[in-house]
């Protein structure tokens, strides 16, 4: 299962670290993905959601 937000699709981004001498090495930026229980179709289900979607209230949490 991929490390993606099930609401907005946010995941990992790739790019380069650039040193002072302008050497470049590949690196990744990881999205802040959390596992939580949410109400999906009226039932609690474990989903992976990014923190921006949690803060924006795009998911109804199941307690």
From Swiss-Prot:
Keywords: Ribonucleoprotein, Ribosomal protein. GO terms for biological process: translation. Residues 21-30 have a biased composition (Basic residues). Residues 11-20 have a biased composition (Polar residues). GO terms for molecular function: structural constituent of ribosome. It comes from the Bacteria. SUPFAM superfamilies: L28p-like. GO terms for cellular component: ribonucleoprotein complex; ribosome. Residues 11-30 are annotated as: Disordered. The keyword Metal-binding does not apply. The keyword Calcium does not apply. Belongs to the bacterial ribosomal protein bL28 family. This is Large ribosomal subunit protein bL28. It comes from Natranaerobius thermophilus (strain ATCC BAA-1301 / DSM 18059 / JW/NM-WN-LF). The lineage of its organism: Bacteria, Bacillati, Bacillota, Clostridia, Natranaerobiales. The gene is rpmB.
